[in-house]
Regions:
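Beta->alpha turn/N-cap motifs
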Residues: 26-32, 66, 124, 141-146, ...
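Alpha-to-beta junction loops
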Residues: 18-27, 88-90, 114, 132-141, ...
């Protein structure tokens, strides 16, 4: 069962309601840690209400722009993006309020000295569509959410937030290659 919504709040509430059912398991994201803190009305205590079993994998994050966006046309590198971002009028689409997306934006603001408006969406697919639809100018997202738009040439990846390039995106430099080793992030699944 897929329970999208509320930065994982819907799934957390559903699984908590299944307490004692040994046939219910949840695969989640980093929002497992942040959502209960930001949505206290859910009444969830991750230490008392859940039993972690394993981390299945980690998913990388990338900086994505619309290839020919009104404010992003002509941006080809992370440095191009940062120069444009310092004008202070870009909009970033992300998944949920106070989610890892918004926290990553805060990290980038501090690292690079720019400001951007954050607009929360209901999920990663909606974030990707919002970028291509021109509702936002950039996003920090995992490859799977943007893959279709990337393959069609509608979106462009500027950097992989990892030490090394990803073989699936050989033309996208890593943050380490560009001299930004602190720009590293993995989403747990």
């Amino acid at each position: 069962i897929n329970k999208p919504g509320g930065s994982g709040g819907e799934a957390l509430t559903y699984v908590k309601g299944k307490s004692g059912d040994q046939h219910t398991i949840m695969i989640t994201l980093n929002s497992f840690f942040t959502t209960p803190q930001n949505q206290t009305e859910l009444g969830i205590n991750i230490l008392d209400d859940y039993t972690p079993l394993a981390r299945l994998l980690t998913d990388t994050f990338m900086v994505w722009i619309k290839k020919d966006g009104a404010k992003t046309s002509g941006i080809n590198t992370l440095d191009d993006f940062l120069a444009r971002a310092k004008q202070g009028d870009l909009v970033m689409g992300g998944t949920g309020k106070m989610s890892e997306d918004e926290l990553l934006l805060g990290m980038m603001r501090g690292m690079f000295g720019f400001d951007a408006k954050y607009v929360p969406y209901s999920g990663g697919g909606a974030v990707a569509k919002g970028l291509i639809g021109g509702e936002s100018d950039f996003t920090l997202n995992n490859p799977s959410e943007q893959m279709g738009f990337y393959q069609s040439g509608d979106s462009k990846a500027l950097v992989m937030m990892t030490p090394k390039r990803n073989p699936a995106f050989p033309e996208v430099p890593s943050s380490y290659e560009l001299g930004y080793p602190d720009l590293e992030y993995y989403m747990m699944r």
